[in-house]
A protein has these predicted regions:
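Sec-dependent N-terminal signal peptides
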Residues: 4-13
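Hydrophobic alpha-helical segments of integral membrane proteins
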Residues: 13-19
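Interaction-mediating elements
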Residues: 21-119
Length: 119
C-alpha cells in the first residue's frame, strides 16, 4: 500500500512539474517575436507591457499572451501574428480593425466601441 501511494505521489509531482514548465512569465519584450513587438509598438505606442506569458507545448513555443498596463490582453501565435485582442477597459485601436468591418460598425453601431476582436 505504501508503495502504491509513493508511486501515485511521484506521478503527481512529475506531472505538476511538467505542467509548470509549460508556461514562462516575463516582462521582457525581447522574449516576443519581432512581429509581435512591432505590432505593439505600432498600435499601442504609449502603453507598457505588464506581463508576458509564453505557453510552451512539446518543447516549442505555442503562443504568447501579453497583458498591457491599460488592461488590454493581446494574444499572438508562435510566429508573432495576433490572434485575439481583448480591450475591455479601453477600446481596440481603429488601426487594427479591417476597413470593411470598421465601415460596417460605423454605419450600424455608431455609438458602440469595439472592445474585442479575433481572427
Amino acid at each position: 500500500m505504501k508503495r502504491l501511494l509513493f508511486i501515485l505521489l511521484s506521478m503527481m509531482s512529475v506531472s505538476a512539474a511538467l505542467r509548470a514548465g509549460n508556461e514562462i512569465r516575463t516582462t521582457d519584450p525581447q522574449k516576443l517575436p519581432a512581429t509581435a513587438r512591432e505590432f505593439i509598438a505600432t498600435h499601442f505606442p504609449d502603453t507598457r507591457i505588464a506581463l508576458i506569458k509564453i505557453d510552451r507545448e512539446g518543447g516549442r513555443t505555442d503562443s504568447y499572451d501579453v497583458l498591457l498596463e491599460n488592461g488590454s490582453d493581446l494574444e499572438f501565435d508562435r510566429r508573432g501574428q495576433w490572434t485575439e485582442i481583448d480591450a475591455e477597459r479601453t477600446t481596440v485601436p481603429q488601426s487594427i480593425i479591417p476597413l470593411r468591418i470598421a465601415d460596417y460598425l460605423k454605419r450600424n453601431y455608431p455609438d458602440r466601441p469595439v472592445v474585442k476582436i479575433d481572427r
